[in-house]
Amino acid sequence: MNIKTQSNLYNAIAYIMREEKTEESLWIGGNAGDNPEEVYRVMMQTKQDWGKLNGRKGYHFVISWKPGECDPEKAYQVLQEFSQEYLGGEYDYVFAIHTDTDHCHGHIIFNSVNRVTGYKYRYERGDWERFIQPVTDKICL
């Protein structure tokens, strides 16, 4: 999912990091900060550093499992490995495992601007099947 405005970026970050969804923040990880304000500030600073304040602000992926198929610890490990492998440490990101439903699921929000090169991430139709699903399959299978 594309995040198109600054307020949408902050709201999405705040939503996935909500304590009541993550067992008091137990299941939150990433490389951009420990609270929504810090993560947002880091992402916006990267955009400012590269002069890329316009356009999409970030991306939000959700990875979910069927009820009973995964526990929070395993889901955390999967999202941590996915973030490291897919984003390669080049994008600011935060991920969170939500345990407030009958099925475990994780959210990843990452900056639209690469903090190393300054290029913007491009997501095109079919990229999930071609590039993203193979990474999750490799980690999960």
Language model features: what each stretch is:
Residues 1-141:
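N-terminal nicking endonuclease/strand-transfer module with a His-rich metal-binding environment
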